[in-house]
Amino acid sequence: MIALLIIDMQKGMFTKETPRYKSDLVNNNINSIADIIRSINGRVIFIQHDGNKEEGYLPNTEEWELIPEIRKNNQDRIIHKTACDSFYKSELEKYLTENAINELVITGCATDYCVDTTIKSATSKDYLVIVPNDGHTTTNRPSISAEQVIDHYNWIWSNLILPKKNIKVLSTNVLIDYLGKKEK
């Protein structure tokens, strides 16, 4: 079975101080992917970072809340995490195992932190991983633009040396076509 992970799409990640690259496009792409995943009886999982007083994102604060631009359905699952790796000391792997999920579409924020760490963790656990190259975002960094960060990580994920070829980096349109074939 397939699942969509939507990582850290929280209000505190999307502020005037931390504008995210092409966030409207990324939000629309995530919504489109979520719609088709639901239509083929896959699972949609929101990964929500639970922070602390020092780093922010305290549970039940406004910055911790999921952004309203990403549509959430009642059957979607929220899994809480406290580290960049969505698997680390969370209920994610247990939920995936209980639901016989072996294929993950990974999206969200930030490309160079939680998205990258979760992708690499998932591959080390032998999940088949698909990354929509236009389904994750970040902000400008001190020595590199957000666009360059995203391009760089899309290239890295496409070229990782793994025992299995288990990362596919595709555009949202190609991914939707691929998922549509699973529906038939």
Task: Outline where the language-model segments fall.
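Short, hydrophobic/glycine-enriched beta-strand segments
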Residues: I2-D8
